[in-house]
């Protein structure tokens, strides 16, 4: 009896295996962290073999601890840290260099060169992205340019490229399936999101041979099966793939045009489903593919906030203001307001809609009466203000007024933050019962492909709310607070 769907959630710091049942509930999960490599300042790399090892370990742990047999798995869904690039040898299956992580800035010079050559507009039109070190394309070029013999091997068709999803499907299938899905392909800087294919002009710009690239498939279909020696003698369908943020949008059942979710992790990622049309952004958002399903493609607008949960970690570890992140809520609630204090946590620059990598963090409005409580509250409020910046851009680009924001991620446990978020947006905020929406989204995509779930309506019915936060703040007050934030942003940008 095929009782479960196994979701593999390959993140930036750890890999997880999560078993879901028919009700979309978590049966069991296992997690394993892996090593972060920082060869030079600003560079971030992972060992792709270690990632693969961590995936095998969490699968084994999860199944054995849950006492679930491999033959009880109906299908496998994969969700992954996006943009991270792996290049490996087709014959040996060994990576020729570490995986270059999405956060890594080692290709900034390549990006500057491409911008100087005037490619920005073409890239924007075809991919919906900006020329930035964040995306995979320049990482692949860097590997081909910097690893001895790599370019020659690539030209001879001896190397393969993949984002993490591609690498894992290739390994699980014993090298039989070299695929990615629309959502991951749309983050590479090499994929035309309108024609839905790898783009020759973009590949020429990056000097990446087409033979390296995976086949691009829907986010929900059977790509292949696990090879028996990697899955305890069983051939289980690998049937769903989506990048982490798109998987979360699916896991939140944001299937309708204009529905949006915000994930509060290390940073924040807000995605709005724009239906079957790609909306070009005039306000610093990315246009991306949400998923491909049943022969149709859904698009999304995406806003990225670089510092969210990491600002709370900074209060805990850097400033030692509390021992546990959950205490931030207690401190913030002890004061009525920040008394005019604003904190702009631009520790690594500002993301959407500013896209300023030079700017650094700042604080404003500090007086002799400012206390630890004010400081903590101002830091939490900064997450909500940054989210409003993104939402304003989304509403302006899409012409859609948001009526509810669904939220997930670590920081959503903080009731103070969620209530303030609702107040400052003047929109209800809904927190789901199952916060593991990324893994759930991948499970749903796989389950639909193997007939474990019938359709999206069945999935929609499984979405249950834990708590709804309603806005109660006077409009005048929230407008005044937000105007102060905008002033703080302008002042921060001026100080370089």
UniProtKB/Swiss-Prot annotation:
GO cellular component: cytosol
Pathway assigned to this chain's UniProt record: Polyol metabolism; glycerol degradation via glycerol kinase pathway; sn-glycerol 3-phosphate from glycerol: step 1/1
Disulfide bonds: none
Binding site for glycerol: 82-83, 134, 244-245
Binding site for ADP: 12, 16, 266, 309, 410, 414
Alphabetical list of PANTHER family matching this protein: GLYCEROL KINASE, SUGAR KINASE
Oligomer and partners: Homotetramer and homodimer (in equilibrium).
Protein name: Glycerol kinase
Organism: Bacillus mycoides (strain KBAB4) (Bacillus weihenstephanensis)
UniProt gene name: glpK
């Amino acid at each position: 009896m095929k009782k479960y769907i196994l979701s593999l959630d390959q993140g930036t710091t750890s890999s997880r295996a999560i078993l879901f049942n028919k009700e979309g509930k978590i049966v069991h999960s296992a997690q394993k962290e892996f090593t972060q490599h920082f060869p030079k300042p600003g560079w971030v790399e992972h060992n792709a073999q270690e990632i693969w090892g961590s995936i095998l370990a969490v699968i084994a742990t999860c199944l054995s601890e849950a006492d679930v047999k491999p033959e009880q798995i109906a299908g496998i869904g994969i969700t992954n840290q996006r943009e991270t690039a792996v290049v490996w040898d087709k014959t040996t299956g060994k990576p020729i260099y570490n995986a270059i992580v999405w956060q890594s800035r080692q290709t900034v010079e390549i990006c500057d060169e491409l911008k100087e050559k005037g490619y920005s507009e073409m890239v924007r039109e075809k991919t919906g992205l900006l020329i930035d070190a964040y995306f995979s394309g320049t990482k692949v070029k860097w590997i081909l340019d910097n690893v001895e013999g790599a370019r020659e091997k690539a030209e001879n068709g001896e190397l393969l490229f993949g984002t993490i999803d591609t690498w894992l499907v290739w390994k699980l299938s014993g090298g039989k399936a070299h695929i990615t899905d629309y959502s991951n392909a749309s983050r590479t800087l090499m994929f035309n999101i309108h024609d839905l294919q790898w783009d020759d002009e973009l590949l020429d710009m990056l000097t990446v041979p087409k033979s390296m690239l995976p086949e691009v498939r829907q986010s929900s279909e059977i790509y292949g099966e696990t090879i028996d020696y990697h899955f305890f003698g069983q051939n289980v369908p690998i049937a769903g793939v989506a990048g982490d943020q798109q998987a979360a949008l699916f896991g939140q059942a944001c299937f309708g045009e204009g529905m949006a979710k915000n994930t509060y992790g290390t940073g924040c990622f807000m995605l709005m489903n724009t239906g079957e049309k790609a909306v070009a952004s005039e306000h610093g958002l990315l246009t991306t593919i949400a998923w491909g399903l049943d022969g149709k493609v859904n698009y999304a607008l995406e806003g990225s906030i670089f510092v969210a949960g990491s600002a709370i970690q900074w209060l805990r570890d850097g400033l030692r203001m509390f021992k546990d992140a959950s205490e931030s809520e207690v401190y913030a609630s002890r004061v009525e307001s920040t008394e005019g204090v604003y904190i702009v946590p631009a520790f690594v620059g500002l993301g959407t809609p500013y896209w300023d990598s030079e700017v650094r963090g700042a604080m404003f409005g500090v007086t002799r009466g400012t206390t630890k409580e004010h400081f903590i509250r101002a830091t939490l409020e900064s997450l909500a203000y940054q989210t409003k910046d993104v939402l304003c851009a989304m509403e302006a680009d899409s012409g859609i007024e948001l009526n509810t924001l669904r939220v997930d991620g670590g920081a959503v446990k903080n009731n103070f933050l969620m209530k303030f978020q609702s107040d400052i947006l003047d929109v209800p905020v809904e927190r789901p019962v199952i916060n593991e929406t990324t893994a759930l989204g991948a499970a749903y995509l796989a389950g639909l492909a193997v007939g474990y779930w019938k359709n999206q309506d069945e999935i929609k019915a499984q979405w249950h709310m834990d708590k709804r936060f309603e806005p109660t703040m006077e409009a005048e007050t929230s407008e005044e607070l937000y105007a102060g934030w905008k002033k703080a942003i302008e002042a921060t940008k001026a100080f370089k």
